[in-house]
Amino acid sequence: MATVKKMLYQQLTAFLLTKLPKRYHGNFYSWIEDGKLLNEGRQVTENGIEVCHLSYNGVFHFEALPFNEISPAYLMAHIQVWVNENDPMRDVLDESEIPFDLDIIDDNTTDLIFTIAFREPLTAMEDNEGELKIDGVNYRLDEIEVFTAEEIDVVVRVEHEHPNGD
């Protein structure tokens, strides 16, 4: 079975773990809530398709965060920068806000929870050994490369009819 690309919330989780001291890793949790499969699949390349889009909230819970040692402001900045650099769908879908809850537990600790809306395509490539059968063709889950035109030349031909019918 081929390796499937990690979902955005999994990628962000891995990134955040690099910003946290190892001793704190056991207090950091992430999961999906309110997930939906959106039937927006379509042929994208000659041998690649979008099976569907995944829409979900990624929840990132920093439990009993020692805020005098680990700055919530830096965590907020790391999350925003990562999302800006790694989630191109946010601009398309006008998802500019990242809600969070910060609950002070005592003079040294807080619970900090971010809920981030993600939407990403689930894509597949044609593969004779693939596990997915779509319209009689075998596919495997995999990334597909989609090229987007940055420039386009438009040629316009304008025809005028003369008043005398010529």
Curated annotation (Swiss-Prot):
<dbReference type="InterPro" id="IPR009678">
    <property type="entry name" value="Phage_tail_completion_R"/>
</dbReference>
<dbReference type="Pfam" id="PF06891">
    <property type="entry name" value="P2_Phage_GpR"/>
</dbReference>
<protein>
    <recommendedName>
        <fullName>Uncharacterized 19.2 kDa protein in rep-hol intergenic region</fullName>
    </recommendedName>
</protein>
